[in-house]
Amino acid sequence: MKRLFLLLITLPLLLCGCGEPNATQTIFAMDTVMTFQVWGTDAPQAVQRISHTISDLESCYNREGLARGAADPAVLQEALDLSRRTGGAFDPQLGSVTALWNFTAEDPKIPTAEQVRDALQEKTWDLGGALKGYAGQKCADILKEMQIDRAILNLGGNVQTYGQKRDGTPWQVGIQNPQGGDPVGILAVEGTASVVTSGDYQRFFEMDGVRYHHILDPKTGYPARSGLHSVTVICRDGMTADCLSTALFVMGLEQGSAFWRESRDFEAVFLTEDGKIYATQGASLSGCDYEVIRR
């Protein structure tokens, strides 16, 4: 059995025109490595507040925090609203199923069909598909409150940009290549936004030549088989971006494109298993050949 758990899921960041940040910090939280780069007079204090906020959110929304009722009911309601919006493709109540698969275990096992069926009935909370996006949004609120000039926060697969670069050009965020190496393309991101990627290469194990990844289909309780390697979502709201990246991966290219056409609050880039790239018409993508998804 081959097992891979990427602790650091980095979208390459090209920060041309910003100069050296006034404060930088790297922490381990929410099962990943996070790096904060902040520009501004109060940057050191901002980095400290961000770090504490991430820690507080993790303790409130991890399995233990959810069990003791530490989560904000409004956040849980927003997660349920996003689940309804996506027709259940994103489901924040797959906690028992996620625990059953246990992708972070040293020796993960494939559960039986009966175990999966029973776990699907339990409906326990798991905010893993929303929490980093929500955290990025909360951090952006802190940066605004502190009147920080600009920042870029890499939350392990989630990138939160804040403010404008000094030279006026967009932030440049690379989309990770599932095979490693250079990014498959570069997104130009204006101002404050959340860029979130969900991919089958981020956390998985292989058994008998089959890859079992951590993005579960809520209808089956098994890893989604949608023909995609990854989906990247660009959105002004971090939690929405996080949830939609998971939902679109589960939906697949055709259904995900139709969902985008009915929406107005995000853009997306789809990377298929056969190596093709599709980007919605509002996504500013360069450095690769791709097909545009139009309304």
Report the location of each language-model feature.
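Mature catalytic core of soluble alpha/beta enzymes
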Residues: 2-295
